[in-house]
């Protein structure tokens, strides 16, 4: 999935990662504290950041993405598809797009084994802040399998080259 989104957004920073699971060349670790670190220190502006925040407390990450969008830094954030929570209401007041991933749930990767883990009990959505002025929040969908298949085709092309 990340490869497909990277093709669309050219993601330059993984804002909540470790050396073992970073998806971008530049990343911010828990110890570096992404909520306190200026993202502009890690990418050219305008640019996009990948953010898969800890699901236990998403609100401060929504606030950080909204703040960074004022600095011409866009964010693509993967979160549970739950529209009943306060952070969702806060996100749609500042985000440019909510993209629901439909047609199945995402399997997450076990950080130790590197293998997909099924049993995700919720669907997922992407909340996107663009690095330019916001006009409204658009609600869209993307098929999970289309996203995964597109990413797999890109990976296969890279490996064949």
List the predicted regions and their residue ranges:
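Class I S-adenosyl-L-methionine-dependent methyltransferase catalytic core
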Residues: 1-161
């Amino acid at each position: 999935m990340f490869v497909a989104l990277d093709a669309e957004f050219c993601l330059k920073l993984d804002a909540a990662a470790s050396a073992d699971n970073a998806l971008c060349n530049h990343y911010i670790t828990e110890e570096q504290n992404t909520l306190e670190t200026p993202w502009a220190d890690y990418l050219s502006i305008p640019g996009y950041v990948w953010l898969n925040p800890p699901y236990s407390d998403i609100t401060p990450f929504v606030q950080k993405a909204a703040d960074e969008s004022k600095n011409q830094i866009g964010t693509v954030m993967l979160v549970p598809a739950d529209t009943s929570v306060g952070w969702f209401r806060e996100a749609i007041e500042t985000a440019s797009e909510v993209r629901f991933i439909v047609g199945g749930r995402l399997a997450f990767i076990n950080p130790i084994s590197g293998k997909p883990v099924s049993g995700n009990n919720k669907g997922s959505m992407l909340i996107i802040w663009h690095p330019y002025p916001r006009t409204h929040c658009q609600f869209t969908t993307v098929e999970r399998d289309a996203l995964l298949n597109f990413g797999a085709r890109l990976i296969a092309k890279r490996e064949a080259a």
